[in-house]
Amino acid sequence: MKITITKNEKEFDCTAAWRIIGQMLNKPESVIGLSTGRTTGNLHRLVGEIYTQYPFKVDTVTFFGLDEVTNVPREYAGACYTMLKTELMDTLGIKEENFLMLPTISGDFEQSCRDFQQEIANRGGIDLLILGLGENGHLGFNQPESPFGGEAWVTRMNVELEERIRRETGTPPDKELGGATLGIKNIMQARRIVLVAKGTNKADIVKRMLEGPVTTDVPASILQLHPNCEFLLDEAAASMLNC
């Protein structure tokens, strides 16, 4: 288990960005998974800025998103597809066939989830997975009590997020919203993981993730058992650790 603590947000974003860039440079055919959210947006944009200044080969890289909101338009600003496309894919010029996402709309989400994880496997599996950390320890849409052996699936999102999305999209109450996500089993199959967390609001869950027991109460605690996982933190997020 490797823990990297950065001094400030600039160093945090730069370190994370170079983890992604280094993977692409070392293996141009890499399969790289990305997560959306407040923690990762700036580091994605930084990857794009560095690429714009110093172009390198990206046309054989496959990117995919860890999760997606269901039953909203794909063009919705809060859809993971739109966020990743805006933050990085457009800047890198990644073609749609090399940008894999779970669908926002599907007639059969169970089949769509199976197809998604199979396509990742067909491309050789996950070389690098960048994970964010929820304040309750969730990974993607794998909330507390999600099974450690679970594969890609659709689960309910938390109430606060669901209410915000309904307001922003005008989705009526009778239309169910969910979160399609790779399961924890899929996550643990990644050859390399970098979990990123910053800010004092993450300090408590970081401590529980790294120093507490491995438990479904804190889904991210399973990463203690991954053979090649780096925990990239800023000083605020690491402030409660004993190490």
Show where each model-derived region lies.
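Glycine-rich N-terminal segment of FAD-binding domains in flavoprotein oxidoreductases
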Residues: 26-52
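A glycine- and small-aliphatic-rich helix-loop capping segment at beta-alpha/alpha-beta transitions
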Residues: 46-57, 80-82, 144-153, 212-214
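Ligand-binding beta-strand-loop-alpha-helix segment within the catalytic cores
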Residues: 56-128
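Short beta-strand segments
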Residues: 33-37, 65, 102-103, 130-133, ...
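N-terminal glycine-/serine-/threonine-rich phosphate-binding loop
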Residues: 1-32
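ATP/nucleoside-binding phosphotransfer catalytic cores, i.e., glycine-rich phosphate-binding loops
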Residues: 182-185, 189-243
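Short glycine-rich anion-binding loops that position phosphate/pyrophosphate groups of nucleotides
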Residues: 38-39, 69, 133-138, 144, ...
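Class I SAM-dependent methyltransferase SAM-binding "motif I" and its flanking Rossmann-like core
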Residues: 136, 140-184
